[in-house]
């Protein structure tokens, strides 16, 4: 993947937020909705954008589509995600996302990234 393509993917705040959360582990769309507070259609659109460019992978688990970072992400993506994690520590929006993810952690530990049983799924 070319560096320009990666930066095209990273130039949107929603995609940055998705990647930051995905850096913590795989999730389904309903989890992203709960964490980011954005509508399903917006999240799905951005996940599709990232997927077609190879920055996220998707796997069907029963009724759920579970998104994750690639098993072997490009070097440029790894470097930019490390920078994002570092910079996000001082950004209230990214901190809120991580706090919401932390609240979901017990549920995720019990059910995994798919099978949350929410009304959305």
Positions of the model-derived regions?
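N-terminal helix-turn-helix DNA-binding core of bacterial DNA-binding proteins
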Residues: 2-42, 48, 64-73
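Compositionally biased, low-hydrophobicity segments enriched in charged and small polar residues
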Residues: 38-45, 58, 99, 103, ...
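C-terminal regulatory/oligomerization modules of transcriptional regulators
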Residues: 52, 71-121
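Hydrophobic alpha-helical membrane-insertion segments
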Residues: 20-24, 55, 106
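Residue-identity detector for glycine
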Residues: 25, 37, 54, 62, ...
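Beta-hairpin "wing" of winged helix-turn-helix
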Residues: 52-61, 68-69
């Amino acid at each position: 993947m070319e560096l320009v393509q990666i930066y095209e993917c990273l130039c949107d705040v929603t995609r940055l937020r998705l990647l930051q959360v995905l850096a913590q582990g795989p999730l389904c769309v309903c989890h992203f909705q709960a964490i980011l507070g954005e509508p399903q259609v917006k999240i799905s659109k951005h996940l599709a954008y990232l997927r077609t460019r190879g920055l996220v992978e998707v796997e069907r688990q029963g009724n759920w589509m579970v998104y994750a970072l690639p098993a072997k992400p490009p070097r440029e993506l790894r470097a930019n995600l490390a920078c994002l994690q570092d910079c996000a520590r001082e950004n209230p929006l990214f901190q809120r996302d991580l706090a919401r993810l932390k609240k979901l952690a017990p549920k995720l530990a019990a059910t995994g990234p798919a099978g949350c049983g929410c009304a959305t799924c």
